[in-house]
């Protein structure tokens, strides 16, 4: 007897905790959030057969420090994502835990015109993808910082 995959059921649960605070009229503040995701399906790395799972689920966290006053906005964000199953099957792939530091600075000249610069992955964190074991390295992406400089005009 066979059952189509699209008739299976699972339950995914999640919680998000978030805090934000500004320090009076100084323009300084912070944001922090933590997202917890869990499902009732576990992937058994010891089985060499097809398993039904929901890939891509993992906990995440972000910590942001910012300044926002008189048209100047500065934002630094530390982002974290826990290890997650990227693809299942006989040869599963796991994306390892990952941190990334980003920044964004912008200045609003008026309601229509603003300038910005942003940096993504400032600390040049690498990304590792492994198979059933962390010793089975499948992909290694060298992390490079990326920068954007731009102008926004609304009319």
State the predicted function of each range:
Residues 7-9, 53, 93, 97, ...:
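Residue-level "hotspot" positions that anchor or transmit function at local structural transition points
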Residues 80-85, 106-155:
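C-terminal beta-signal and adjacent terminal beta-strands/loops
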Residues 59-70, 101-105, 136-138, 149-151:
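Feature captures outer-membrane beta-barrel proteins of Gram-negative bacteria and organelles
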Residues 23, 56, 67, 94-96, ...:
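Surface-exposed coil/turn segments at beta-strand junctions on protein surfaces, enriched
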Residues 2-88, 123:
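Gram-negative outer-membrane beta-barrel transporters
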Residues 28, 34-36, 66-69, 73, ...:
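Residue-level detection of beta-strand scaffold positions
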Residues 88-94, 132:
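Short, surface-exposed loop/helix-turn segments at secondary-structure junctions
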Residues 11-13, 57-61, 97-101, 143-147:
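Residues that define the transmembrane beta-barrel architecture of outer-membrane proteins
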């Amino acid at each position: 007897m066979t059952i189509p995959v699209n008739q299976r059921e699972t339950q995914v649960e999640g919680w998000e905790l978030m805090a934000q605070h500004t320090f009076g009229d100084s323009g300084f503040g912070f944001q922090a959030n933590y997202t917890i995701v869990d499902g009732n399906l576990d992937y058994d790395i010891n089985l060499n057969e097809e398993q039904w799972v929901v890939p891509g689920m993992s906990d995440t966290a972000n910590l942001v420090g910012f300044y926002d006053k008189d048209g100047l906005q500065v934002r630094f964000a530390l982002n974290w994502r826990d290890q997650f199953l990227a693809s299942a099957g006989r040869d599963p792939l796991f994306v390892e835990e990952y941190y990334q530091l980003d920044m964004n600075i912008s200045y609003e000249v008026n309601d229509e015109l603003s300038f910005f610069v942003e940096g993504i992955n400032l600390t040049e964190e690498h990304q590792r993808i492994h198979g059933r074991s962390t010793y089975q390295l499948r992909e290694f992406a060298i992390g490079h910082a990326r920068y954007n400089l731009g102008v926004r005009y609304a009319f």
